[in-house]
Regions:
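Extreme N-terminal leader/targeting segments of oxidoreductases
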Residues: 1-36
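Glycine-rich FAD pyrophosphate-binding loop
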Residues: 57-74
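Dinucleotide-binding Rossmann-like beta1-alpha1 core, especially the glycine-rich loop
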Residues: 82-165
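Helical element adjacent to the flavin cofactor pocket in flavoenzyme catalytic cores
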Residues: 179-218
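N-terminal Rossmann-like FAD-binding beta1-loop-alpha1 element of flavoenzymes
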Residues: 36-60
């Protein structure tokens, strides 16, 4: 592990400016042993570390920069059901059972986030209510088709808003011909959520280290038995050797 990476300790974002109690984690001062090493401190890596620690595993998570310096701490915070493509598109790309699995995973993601926020009491400004808006009639027809498709698959949280004047009264502009309201999608403050995951993972026993870049992975018989890579394969100027499966 390399502790000499150029870092972005000052996150310099509106999300960071809203937070006074940012968690801080050290860089390691000696060699470390663990059962599972997680590389990358974004949503995916931190959730993996939390879940593994909650299930009794000895976990270390290392982050080359500081927690929240990448996309997980800087994104739009949208908490939305489904995928960017509809189920018909997914079904054309995959066998039926795999397409259904992918679809179900996307639809359950919001519920998993909600459960995690409640269980760990994460204050991340989670709010529900989301509008998919249509600028013209063709887009509105696509949204109505989405409404019908999701309803057939058992998702009953969508409401079509196809009265332009009524919609304008809610959102303050008449630029849209209509919208689809999703009562089970919403928004979070992503950096607060990530910090909440980090605190929960640490409380569960995961060891978290910042400013700790991984430059190489070697398979040895007496170190971490598993390594989970949840970051870019080539952070900055580092070289990275993947562990053989």
């Amino acid at each position: 592990m390399n502790q000499n990476f150029e870092t972005m300790t000052d996150l310099n974002s509106i999300y960071a400016a809203e937070i006074n109690d940012k968690p801080k984690f050290p860089a390691p001062t000696s060699n470390l042993d663990c059962e599972i090493a997680v590389i990358g401190g974004g949503f995916t890596g931190m959730t993996a570390a939390l879940t593994l620690a909650e299930n009794g595993h000895d976990v270390i998570l290392v982050e080359a920069d500081v927690i929240g310096s990448g996309g997980s701490g800087r994104n739009g915070g949208h908490v939305c059901q489904g995928w960017s493509n509809d189920f018909q598109y997914i079904s054309r790309q995959l066998p039926a059972d795999e397409a259904q699995f992918i679809w179900d995973a996307g639809m359950s993601a919001v519920d998993l986030l909600r459960q995690r926020v409640l269980r760990h009491k994460i204050d991340c400004d989670l709010r529900f209510g989301y509008l998919h808006v249509a600028l013209h009639e063709r887009q509105m027809q696509e949204l109505l088709a989405m409404h019908d498709e999701w309803q057939v698959k058992g998702y009953d949280h969508l409401t079509a808003l196809d009265n332009r004047d009524s919609l304008a009264g809610h959102i303050g502009t008449n630029a849209y011909v209509g919208a689809l309201h999703d009562a089970n999608s919403g928004h979070i403050q992503p950096l607060k959520y990530l910090y909440g995951l980090a605190r929960a993972a640490s409380a569960a026993g995961a060891r978290i280290y910042e400013n700790t870049g991984v430059t190489e992975l070697d398979m040895t018989p007496d170190k971490a038995r598993h390594c989970l890579l949840y970051t870019s394969p080539s952070p900055r100027d580092a070289t990275l050797s993947r562990m053989p499966s």
